[in-house]
Amino acid sequence: FVLLTNAPRPNSTVIDFLKKMGLKKFYEDVYTSGEASLKYLMENFLNSKFYHIGPPRDFDLFKRFEQNKVSNINQADYFICTGLFEDHETKLEYYKDLLEKFSNKKFVCTNPDLIVDRGDVREFCAGSVAKIFEEIGGKVIYFGKPYPPVYNLSANINGKNVLCIGDNM
């Protein structure tokens, strides 16, 4: 079976992580929402400037075109959201203020989950920022479960039944 995850990272990063945990024998292949979004970006935005919304640990997803990353939001052609900034993890209002005047730009969400529970701590995910962008009138392109593109890209599933087991949104 294919392990499909909403991790905003390349397939290879997650495969390496699973191997270290001794889990290689439990799956045939791995496909991440990060890999799906990367494929889309390489095909559609290869030479465009982007502004990354998310923690630095997620930036390995964009190594192939990091020269297109801008630190000034005003210079961005589009946004890539992998999560929340480390210094703004709890206040979603920050993102509304940050993005309000940019609702005409594309917004790529690499993990549509709204929240994640890490032990006893509940944290916002990239999907929460994407929802705010939609609320201010922006258009979001989602990659990850439950959106169809990630299934279509992860395996040749046309005409096949798919069982998806998730934990939350």
Indicate where each model-derived feature is located:
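HAD-like aspartate-dependent phosphatase fold
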Residues: 1-169
